[in-house]
Amino acid sequence: MEHLVQVSERTWLDSEAFELTCTRPQRFTFVAGQHVRLSYDGLVREYTIVSGTDESMLRFLIKRVPGSGLSARLAETAIGTSLNLGEPTGYLTFQSSDKISVFIASGVGVAPFVAMARSGVQGFILIQGARNYSGLFYRPLLEGAALTWVGCVSRPTDERQADSIFHGRVTDYVCDHLSPGNYDFYLCGSRPMIHDMTHLLDERYPNARVYSEAYS
């Protein structure tokens, strides 16, 4: 089943990524962490919802990819434009557990964890990776919800922030700094990150449950 929604707002988070806000259809429900198919003018793409489950609007974290794809169109389309919205799907959703939940994200892969935080999930460890400081999206929200928030920047450009941010990849941080523990891991990001992190966790935490989702 498809729904018709309208673009109501676009907020740029840095030079490449923006949050797109759309109307929410009546009786449209989803679980924090799920994604939907958006389509416009023959272009189709899956995007993770970053709204809280009880919010009146639907929000999406989108990275603009230069060219003729959907993200480039959504970066410029007029407020009020109608989009087609598919039904929610995906299984990277929060599972209640007596273990400590560790969320690990790279880039816009932080999206499902934003939705979880906006839906009331708290007390997790979040290891958030980006190329530079501006790519650590939603930091105030996530720091407030997390037990521990760690920002990892692989290509730092501002040494003044060196004291509060880890310089390196999320895999480097987990390898060198994540203490032994009883964890559930949730991974979202690029396929290379998911591959490398899964291999690392299998070695370091063989009894841990690992939930993952890669974006293309």
Where are these regions (language model features)?
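Ferredoxin-reductase
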Residues: 2-79, 154-155
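FNR/FR-type flavoprotein reductase catalytic core
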Residues: 69-216
